[in-house]
A protein has these predicted regions:
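Bacterial N-terminal signal peptides that target proteins for export
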Residues: 1-8
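Boundary at the C-terminal end of the N-terminal hydrophobic targeting segment
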Residues: 18-22
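Second-shell loop/turn segments in exported
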Residues: 78-90, 153-159, 310-318, 327-328, ...
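Bacterial N-terminal signal peptides
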Residues: 9-17
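Papain-like cysteine protease catalytic cores
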Residues: 119-252
Length: 472
């Protein structure tokens, strides 16, 4: 009896302590009264509430002085090309990367020949390779507990449709490319959610099975045989949703007006890659990033931020915006478009296709300020690289300094500026994150930095945890 009373008393004491701890940090009745008392009781606030209650916040926050005609002149501009639409998918990285490759092909032929690459074809192998990356990652970490940070990383997101330019390079080199007309988009390529959900669920199931096989002491050979069987199921699911990858096709290139040039030829995907790209992509470019949290002129690498198990992680040189701008300008002046990525949802006037830090004045509407720096926004998960677009033009002042930039987007030709977006240089500085630059436009001192042994960054880092938020 005494023991029972002691246990009850101990539990009661614990609950009282827990209650006291909660109350000390919670919103008390007195605190709530103070909060309510601090609210302005002006008629203007009542008017603001009535306006916000019936309208979109962005519409009410628009800076009227920024609503004039947008200057569409650019002193440096690469040749225009057709605009694509990624639809309800997170494949912006692929659209931007292939935009660069098809632009390079046209440029190498005096802009007299065009090519449209199949996104569906490359996406098939992207999803198959990411499935293998997950399964092999589970095997490699199978002796760690499920609560381990790396194990949780894999099971949290076994498969996604986001990515980076290193994925385009690795996948295209390994599997080749095919024309869009040979393997066009399917419904699931343009609407990835359900397909991805089903394959993701299957991968998690397989991941648990592989962990059990390791725990039971199965041989590596037996485990690899089973993994191959698992990937066969994934392959079938992808074949039924995206179509089985083309292995050989007949194709004739077309001029700018869509007229066929020459006699049609038969290609394999690898042969078509050699015909259009002409050689390895890896090793020809650097990936620059602006992350003000970390020291500049250092090389970093993001663990497991790759598309294929045997491929390349996202390795980048951290640079000031000014250095990145100068490399971009040099490339654009030579007619070369660039893969780039941004936090596109910030201060975006989507209808006008215009990005400027003064597009919306949320602070005045709510009677507060939003003063965080770029570094602070990254550290607190408030900002990061969310959407890839193709940098295509820059407008320079009399001193050669950038005023504004232009990008080809992948939200369709009816979006923004005929499928493009214009961004002011001040917006570029705040919300630009990644740029892929051919090494011929990179200064020698930065090339030397790129050769450093990279500092490894964990994939849970805030800058990489929000990738692909705004892609769709």
């Amino acid at each position: 009896m005494n023991t029972r009373h002691s246990v009850l008393g101990f539990c009661l004491a614990l609950s009282l302590v827990a209650g006291a701890q909660t109350n000390s940090g919670g919103i008390s009745a007195d605190m709530l009264r103070q909060i309510e008392k601090a609210q302005p009781a002006s008629s203007s606030d009542k008017a603001i509430f009535n306006a916000i209650a019936s309208n979109n916040i962005d519409d009410l926050s628009k800076n009227f002085r920024n609503q004039g005609p947008i200057d569409t002149y650019f002193s440096v501009e690469t040749p225009k090309q057709s605009i694509h639409d990624q639809k309800s998918s997170g494949r912006c990285w692929m659209f931007s990367g292939l935009n660069v490759l098809r632009s390079n092909f046209s440029r190498n032929h005096g802009d007299s020949i065009t090519v449209e690459f199949s996104h569906d074809y490359l996406f098939f192998f992207d999803q198959l390779e990411k499935s293998n990356l997950f399964l092999q990652g589970v095997i490699d970490n199978a002796k760690k507990p499920m609560e381990d940070e790396r194990v949780r990383f894999f099971f949290k997101s076994p498969l996604n449709d986001g990515g980076t330019f290193c994925g385009v390079a690795d996948l295209a080199e390994k599997y080749g490319l095919v024309p869009k007309s040979v393997q066009p988009e399917t419904f699931s390529a343009e609407n990835t959610r359900i397909m991805s959900r089903l394959i993701t669920s299957k991968l998690r199931e397989y991941g648990l099975e592989l962990r059990k096989m390791v725990a039971d002491g199965k041989s590596q050979k037996t485990i690899q045989v089973r993994k191959t069987e698992m990937l066969s199921t994934v392959y079938r699911m992808l074949s039924l949703t995206l179509g089985e990858p083309v292995k050989e096709f007949t194709y004739a290139f077309k001029d700018k007006n869509g007229k066929a040039i020459g006699t049609p030829k038969t290609y394999t995907p690898q042969e078509f890659y050699q015909e259009t790209v002409g050689g390895p992509l890896n090793g020809t470019f650097i990936m620059a990033m602006n992350d003000p949290r970390r020291p500049y002129y250092q090389t970093y690498e993001v663990e497991y931020d790759r598309h294929t198990y045997d491929g390349h992680n996202w390795k980048y040189v951290n640079l000031p915006v000014e250095d990145i701008s100068q490399m971009a300008i040099a490339s654009l002046k030579d007619g070369r478009k660039l893969y780039s990525s941004y936090d596109v949802g910030k201060q975006l006037d989507r209808k006008r296709g215009y990005l400027d830090t003064d597009n919306f004045d949320y602070g005045t509407l709510f009677g507060t300020t939003f003063p965080m720096t770029k570094a602070e926004r990254i550290s607190t998960f408030d900002s990061g690289s969310t959407h890839a677009m193709t940098l295509t033009a820059v407008d320079l002042d009399a001193n050669g300094k950038p005023i504004k930039w232009k990008v080809e987007n992948s939200w369709g030709a009816d979006n923004g500026q005929k499928g493009c977006m214009i961004m002011t240089n001040r917006w570029f500085g705040e919300y630009m994150f990644r740029l892929v630059v051919d090494k011929k436009y990179v200064p020698e001192n930065i090339l030397k930095v790129e050769q450093q042994k990279p500092i490894m960054v964990m994939p849970e880092d805030p800058l990489f945890g929000v990738d692909n938020d705004e892609c769709q």
